[in-house]
Amino acid sequence: MKNYIDGGEAILEAFRQLDIDYVIASPGSEWGSVWEAFARQEREKTEGPKYLNCAHETLAVDLAIGYSVMTGRMQAVMLHTGVGLLQGSIGIDTAYRQSVPMVVVSGESLSYSEHDGFDPGPQWHGVLSVVGGPTVLASGITKWSQSVSSQHTLYEQLIRAGEMAQRSPAGPVYMSVPIETMLHDWTPPQAPRAVPPAPKPVPPAKDIEAVADMLLNAKNPAIVAESIGRDPAGYSATVELSEMLAIPVSECRWLDFTNFPKEHPMYQGMGEPDYLKDCDVVLTLRARAPWTPPSAKPANAKIVNIDETPFRPHMVHQSLQADIFLEGDAIATLQSLNSIIRDRIVDAEVSQRWEKWSKVHNDMVARNKAIEADGLSKETITPIGLCATLSALLPDEAVFVDETITHRPIIIRHLDYRGPRSFYTAATGGLGQGLGLALGTKLARPDCFVVSVIGDGSFMYNPVVQSLTLSKHEELPIFVVIFNNMGYSAMRKEHHSYYPNGLAANNSTSVGHTITDMDYAELARAFGFYGRKVDRLIELENAIKEGQRAVCSGQTAILNVVLDEGDTSI
């Protein structure tokens, strides 16, 4: 039995040095060298990443995203040449847009069976080759894409890729690794260096002090947050700043993460509240699109933007309208700002602001509760009634992973989630990722009750069979709640808004809206999971409790909730 030390070992050793927990794979035939290295790792009891096999590329990438979002730790994804890269591209694009670090690798062949004594297989020259190499497929959705140069550079190129992925702005990087390179002998470095964490640069102290002075002198400041809450430290720093100066906090329409406690007196909801027009200083925290249209900034306010990368390279149009940019690590910058304000004498007007915004918050809560009470008074199930019932029954520590479109504003307003990382959404426009993100969340937090709230249209885009298979084999039970409005409501809404007096609007039809009716709960039973369809409010509480018990016993549950089409709030 020969012990091969080749390019496969170089790849695995690079992942070890990058402190990666999982190599998540939907692989192809090129990865024999890496599998051999994993076999060696197991035989020799070497510490290193675990290998997790998926049956779908998008699922593999989304598992890595969900895991990284919940842990703050970069993971690796292994795909099959260009075709696998294309299949996983929607997930890679999400990672790019949400600044999730990730090392993505796929293989290629350079010899195409022309090398005497080595035949990678006829598929490489016949159907799998990509003109220009697979890197051309990844260049628009990654920070950096490159083919490995040789067996001599393989290890350090992967290390560099991982370091680059974690540098600001964080994001996925891609490397194509030729089979021929992986099969070459490799000599490990005698003293491999420990890869240091990425630095966290902050703006100049004088700039932070100037913003502190602005906030201390402001009569009517406000905070607009989009994704500062992705890290619990950002969530806590936002709360501290708001409390010190009694600053109201609203969340952007396209929030990716919960950023502020919904029950806090300074929380003012989601969207673009009217009070922004009267503010004199508005602080935007990791906000790529704080208002719509982009040019419609609060007219009377000085805008201060705190972000690692204010100008997102993936956005075609972005008009932040900021007067001051504190560009650098957003959390470290916010913490520095807090430390300055903490040592200053706070104006007496702060207590008056606290009273004012507490009342506004309480009024908002009262309105929401009244709306929820109305939803709970009906025989059918409205989206608001569903959110209120889930809030009443599910544990406070539950994590909600959202992939809805039309119902997202309702969910954000009426679903009670508590604490940092309790709500996460892939708000990039690319559907078909909710189940993978939820499973990645469960992989990262196995003791947590994870809920996938997902529209019926979004559900249909997901690799459902592969996701349920992974859930079963890896023992990752999640609670899937389908907001089933029996169609693509977002498509119908936009169609009718473009043609309000058109044929479709006047006849209540839309060819782009229809989804073939099916009972999604039946899919659960094929895997031995819990599944139930419910369309009456009187049945909902029991169905949720049954699903919760199933998840707590180790089974994934799918609750197909048929919503009242008469609900005009959507």
Where in this protein do the model-derived segments appear?
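N-terminal alpha/beta PP-like core and its mobile active-site loop of ThDP/TPP-dependent enzymes
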Residues: 1-345, 393-396, 449, 468, ...
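Short, well-ordered beta-to-alpha junction loops that form the rim of enzyme active sites
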Residues: 176-180, 226-227, 403-407, 561-564
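Phosphate/pyrophosphate-binding active-site segments
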Residues: 1-2, 149-152, 300-404, 508, ...
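Active-site flanking residues adjacent to catalytic metal/cofactor-binding acidic residues
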Residues: 107, 285, 306-307, 402, ...
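Active-site diphosphate/adenylate-binding microenvironment
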Residues: 8-18, 29-30, 34-38, 359-447
